[in-house]
From Swiss-Prot:
Gene (name only): rplB
One Pfam family here: Ribosomal_L2
Subunit structure: Part of the 50S ribosomal subunit. Forms a bridge to the 30S subunit in the 70S ribosome.
PROSITE patterns membership: RIBOSOMAL_L2
Region: Disordered, residue numbers: 223-274
Keyword Ion transport applies: no
NCBIfam families: rplB_bact
Name of protein: Large ribosomal subunit protein uL2
Gene3D superfamilies assigned: 2.30.30.30, Nucleic acid-binding proteins, Ribosomal protein L2, domain 3
Source organism of this protein record: Shewanella baltica (strain OS155 / ATCC BAA-1091)
Entry similarity comment: Belongs to the universal ribosomal protein uL2 family.
Amino acid sequence: MAVIKCKPTSPGRRHVVKVVNTDLHKGKPFAGLLAKKSKSGGRNNTGRITVRHVGGGHKQHYRLIDFKRDKDGIPAKIERLEYDPNRTANIALVLYADGERRYILAAKGMQAGDKIQSGVAAEIKTGNAMPLRNIPVGSVVHAVEMKPGKGAQIARSAGAYVQVVARDGAYATLRLRSGEMRKVPVDCRATFGEVGNAEHMLRQLGKAGAKRWRGIRPTVRGVAMNPVDHPHGGGEGRTSGGRHPVTPWGVPTKGYKTRSNKRTDKYIVRRRNK
């Protein structure tokens, strides 16, 4: 994997930094694991904008990823690594011994031809998945479930990982990259290793159009709007907004705590670092 800075042959190329991975499959994805992906433009069923800055972009197919890794005891081989437009991580097409194919997240160091396995009997090796009760304390893992059988929810993006720091009774304690320490049931599954494509953070799109290809629309400052559109809007000439920063709906921003799910507070041992 290489980080390439483009020659400044045009204003749109001047600041482009690409991440090139020659190991990725150059053909079409596996058709049996594709699903239709409709664009909403950020609108809900009533036509109102519920998510800002969304719209347009290249047409995409969703890749059905196996986040549960519940095919226990059946060895599998990595057929190839692929690009996935729906996430920052790359994905791997896996062929099981019984003939079934699935997509999984491509871990750091994973290559075509590698053997992987899921379940209690799997060895401690990058790409293998098993319950947290069987994972040694101190191990680095990714694709961690929060509820047994629900599928991975933690550490799924490029370069992500968590560390198992303790195990006590029915819960294992994980240290997340944010600094948060969190308890997770020991029956939840995790996959050894880090998520691959960590160089993704080094890329630079270089121009506004590259954002539009990805379906991301412009973000307009509140002070540049009219009063009807934003609490910071209006005024004669340029203004500073005239109040502490708020969202378009008047909720304080920049450090204001909005977490309200007290029910799961008991699972957070330590809040994330600021």
